[in-house]
Amino acid sequence: MCSAGRFILGGGGYLFKFSEVIKHKMTTKDIDFGYTSDHARKNADAVLPEIQCWPNQYKRDYNIKIELPEFTSVCPKTGLPDFGLITIDYVPNELCLELKSLKFYLLEYRDMGIFMENIANKILDDVVKACKPKRATITGEFTPRGGLRSIITASYDEKEGYGK
């Protein structure tokens, strides 16, 4: 939507007058947004720096919450930056995440074209692979784009696996 808020952008870069969309009851089926499966898969399986760990010293369950308030990535379709807060919330098992390597891992997303939904799921996969926690939840709270704010949450439980 342009700054005047009176046009919407359709596939192929065509602008549609918002009043015409309403008047003709144009739906999203009438507009080709141009997203492909290549866009959806882009960098979902990218190889990133290893997240290192250190031995947990306690047998009890306790929660570790790590926040990166200045997370950035790039939309694979538009090439525009995405900004957000990434929260890693986990209960360690035998290993804890080492913060410096985690920081370098997360910085790799800065210039990477990847959808927000893939970010939360990829970080979860890589955290689980690195430290095999009892439980982990990754939340990505992204700044609004086009007036819509996206909050993506992906979870893991060692007893139930991914999802419930």
What are these regions (language model features)?
Residues F18-K164:
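N-terminal intrinsically disordered, cationic/polar leader segments
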Residues G11-G12, K25:
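N-terminal regions of proteins, emphasizing targeting and processing segments when present
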Residues F7, Y14-F18:
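Aromatic (phenylalanine/tyrosine) cluster motif
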